[in-house]
From Swiss-Prot:
Enzyme Commission number, as recorded: 7.1.1.-
Protein name: NAD(P)H-quinone oxidoreductase subunit 5, chloroplastic
Annotated TM spans: 9-29, 40-60, 89-109, 125-145, 147-167, 219-239, 257-277, 280-300, 327-347, 354-374, 396-416, 425-445, 540-560, 594-614
Lineage: Eukaryota, Viridiplantae, Streptophyta, Embryophyta, Tracheophyta
Quaternary structure annotation from Swiss-Prot or TrEMBL: NDH is composed of at least 16 different subunits, 5 of which are encoded in the nucleus.
Species this protein is from: Pachira aquatica
Topology of the protein relative to the lipid bilayer: Multi-pass membrane protein
Biological role stated in the UniProt entry: NDH shuttles electrons from NAD(P)H:plastoquinone, via FMN and iron-sulfur (Fe-S) centers, to quinones in the photosynthetic chain and possibly in a chloroplast respiratory chain. The immediate electron acceptor for the enzyme in this species is believed to be plastoquinone. Couples the redox reaction to proton translocation, and thus conserves the redox energy in a proton gradient.
GO CC terms of this entry: chloroplast thylakoid membrane
Enzyme class: translocase
Coiled-coil segments: none
Chief location: plastid
Keywords: Chloroplast, Membrane, NAD, NADP, Plastid, Plastoquinone, Quinone, Thylakoid, Translocase, Transmembrane, Transmembrane helix, Transport
Biological process according to GO: ATP synthesis coupled electron transport; electron transport coupled proton transport
């Protein structure tokens, strides 16, 4: 056991040789390195697998005998100051290492095929390896200085990966947006680290917590000052984990390749923000105002992320807002003091969301066979539909991930989300009502994505791409604002379906299946397909393994008997655990209470699924569905008012709550206006004074010269 801990310092450095060797190869042997580029995936996966095995061994040691191991080296700068750096291994480090390495391995396997035709293949694997190194270094850091250094490396790698296709203006803007947004909170984090050192004189976690707590209990430091210090430390996690109001970078981060999106949303970037809070929880827990702030930010993010996901057309942006909402659940649990539930949901959500993102990548990959490389089309759910029969394996995997996200038993997210929802009643009834209601919204937007993508007919074959309507009288339009003969425009839920307001829908006959499909050949592809096609095996394999994780990872929190003592693997792994809502950590709630809460949560999720099915199932598959819509449209005289309300909600959701617009007007344009004003003042006033003095001196001198001459 001691051997395992002694060599734990190598964890962050194992993947590091890959980017170094790729860089040296491109510098010294550029042609050979590029020609043999596919060989770099194997060592990348191999080295990360070694770290995974090491992490599993550490976790087994933690289960058998929970302990904290810290080793530091002292670097004495002078007699008054010495800096210590080292590594810190506890249960949080071991479980997060397993999470990051497993998801990272699956993403690397997937990306080998996904990025095989991209000219930036080598750059992709170099960045990914550096990303994993940075995240593993963040986990094993023993003090706040090391945390900050690896924190910045994680931010830098996310900047490089989000802007991977930097020649596209959208990707360049997205990576700049992520960088600037995170710099705001990173500045707050750096201030808080300095303030914490000024108060305690220590950077090491254990010394910092002990001194900080003693100062507060003995009233030796001003309470407002320590509250400000803790707030600045928490601010670092707000942007990194996409919490309100600094969540705006997360949807735009979808401009990067899909494997990058999977890694950022499941195991690295956003997980770093969540990781920081439990790492510093012994410091936050003695300041009730900070815990209340954390829970408040969490519940706002939960609701905002779910509502903004309801109307997104881009499949990856919809999943991005889903991630934002689920991160809000984790932050809510941490603010409530439910340490175990928060980390459990981080684990289950990571595997489920990685599965969904890799599934969306498979969908995009199949759509590109028809529309070519065009993210506006290949990622747009308006052009999808009916993919179930074309990509059946992807459909099954995506359905499993969707059901898990909805909280359907026995899938992974059911166990963790149900625990958070149950604890929320003990903390605040208002927060509980919002959290439970959002669980229904989660099921609704998740199944909306599934239904629009896999059910119905492939809409891509019933439209052309020039923004002009096809000559066929059978064009399928799920979105439309103008009246047609077969659908009552006054149906009160119709505005919710409006996504393309400039095009008229066409009437559908009963012989839709007789329509000739269109082969598209004008998007730069030498070979075109009439139908989307399933991805290659190297892309399907990691998805199927993630399906197994999604099915069975929830079992680590199921309690069982061992010699008359109730315990579960997760509690053993997270010992010592902090839970303010359950002071007796060994007493588990009885099965009756569990079944009651589970039945209620599943009922809410089922209602959300039913709502999505009612609104987004393939309406045009039969005339009965159309008659059903018209029957709904005849209800009551208030339907026009309800239509307006629903349309306003939809418009607000589709436009991201106008938060990005507000930031663009108030901050971006304001700063540019200030810069232009400063430039004008500098050129016209400062330079004008200088030039005016010189010109005046010149003419005065010339005048004196003339008079004197």
């Amino acid at each position: 056991m001691e051997h395992t801990y002694q060599y734990s310092w190598i964890i962050p450095f194992v993947p590091l040789p890959i980017p170094i060797k790729i860089g040296m190869g491109l510098l010294l042997f550029p042609m050979a390195t590029k020609n043999l580029r596919r060989m770099w995936a194997f060592p990348n996966i191999l080295l990360l697998s070694i770290v995974m095995i090491f992490s599993v061994d550490l976790s087994i040691q933690q289960i058998n005998r929970s302990s904290i191991y810290q080793y530091v080296w002292s670097w004495t700068i002078n007699n008054d100051f010495s800096f210590e750096f080292g590594y810190f291994i506890d249960s949080l480090t071991s479980i997060m290492s397993i999470l990051i390495t497993t998801v990272g391995i699956f993403v690397l396997i997937y990306x080998d095929n996904y990025m095989s035709h991209d000219q930036g293949y080598l750059r992709f694997f170099a960045y990914m390896s550096l990303f994993n190194t940075s995240m593993l270094g963040l986990l094993t850091x023993s003090n706040l200085i090391q945390i900050y250094x690896f924190w910045e490396l994680v931010g830098m790698c996310s900047y490089l990966l989000i802007g991977f296709w930097f020649t596209x203006p959208a990707a360049a803007n997205a990576c700049q947006k992520a960088f600037v947004t995170n710099r705001i909170c990173d500045f707050g984090l750096s201030l808080x680290i300095l303030r914490x050192y000024w108060i305690t004189g220590x950077f090491e976690f254990q010394d910092l917590f002990e001194i900080f707590n003693n100062l507060i209990y003995n009233n030796e430091v001003h309470f407002l000052f320590v509250t400000l210090c803790a707030s600045l430390l928490f601010a670092g996690a707000v942007a990194k984990s996409a919490q309100f109001p600094l969540h705006v970078w997360l949807p735009d981060a979808m401009e990067g390749p899909t494997p990058i999106s999977a890694l950022i949303h499941a195991a690295t970037m956003v997980a770093a923000g969540i990781f920081l809070v439990p790492r510093l929880l012994p410091l936050f827990i003695v300041i009730p105002y900070i815990m209340n702030l954390i829970s408040l930010i969490g519940i706002i993010t939960v609701l905002l992320g779910a509502t903004l996901a309801l109307a997104q057309k881009d499949i990856k942006r919809g999943l991005a807002y889903s991630t934002m909402s689920q991160l809000g659940y984790m932050m809510l649990a941490l603010g409530m003091g439910s340490y175990r539930a928060a980390l459990f949901h981080l684990i289950t959500h990571a595997y489920s969301k990685a599965l969904l993102f890799l599934g969306s990548g498979s969908i995009i990959h199949s759509m590109e066979a028809i529309v070519g490389y065009s993210p506006d089309k290949s990622q747009n759910m308006v052009f999808m539909g009916g993919l179930r029969k074309h990509v059946p394996i992807t459909q099954i995997a995506f359905l499993v991930g969707t059901l898990s996200l909805c909280g359907i038993p026995p899938l992974a997210c059911f166990w963790s989300k149900d625990e958070i929802l149950s604890d929320s009643w003990l903390y605040s009834p208002i927060f509980a009502i919002i959290a439970w209601s959002t669980a229904g919204l989660t099921a609704s937007y998740x199944f909306r994505i599934y239904l629009l993508t896999f059910e119905g007919h492939x809409n891509i074959h019933f439209q052309n791409y020039s923004x002009k309507k096809x000559s066929s009288x059978y064009s399928i339009k799920l979105w439309g604002k103008e009246e047609q003969k077969m659908i009552n425009r006054n149906f009160r839920l119709f505005p919710l379906l409006t996504m393309n307001n400039n095009e008229k829908p066409y009437r559908i006959g009963g012989n839709v299946k007789k329509v000739a499909l269109i082969t598209i050949t004008n998007f730069g592809y030498k070979k075109a397909f009439s139908y989307p096609h399933e991805s290659d095996n190297t892309m399907l394999f990691p998805m199927l393994i993630l399906v197994l994780f999604t099915l069975f990872v929830g079992a680590i929190a199921i309690p069982f008997n061992q010699e008359g003592i109730h315990f579960d693997i997760l509690s053993k792994l997270l010992t010592p655990s902090i839970n303010l809502l359950h002071q007796n950590s060994n007493d588990f709630e009885d099965w009756y209470q569990f079944l009651t809460n589970a039945t209620f949560s599943v009922s809410i999720a089922s209602f959300g699924i039913f709502t999505a099915f009612l609104l987004y199932k393939p309406f045009y598959s039969s005339l009965q569905n159309l008659n059903l819509l018209n029957s709904f449209a005849k209800r009551g005289p208030k339907r026009i008012f309800l239509d307006k309300i629903i349309y306003l909600i939809y418009d607000w959701s589709y436009n991201r709550g106008y938060i990005d617009t507000f930031y663009s007007i108030s901050l971006t344009k304001g700063i540019r206006g200030l810069a232009e004003l400063t430039h004008f003042f500098d050129r016209r006033v400062i330079d004008g004074i200088t030039n005016g003095v010189x010109i005046t001196s010149f003419f005065v001198g010339e005048g004196i010269k003339y008079v004197g001459g």
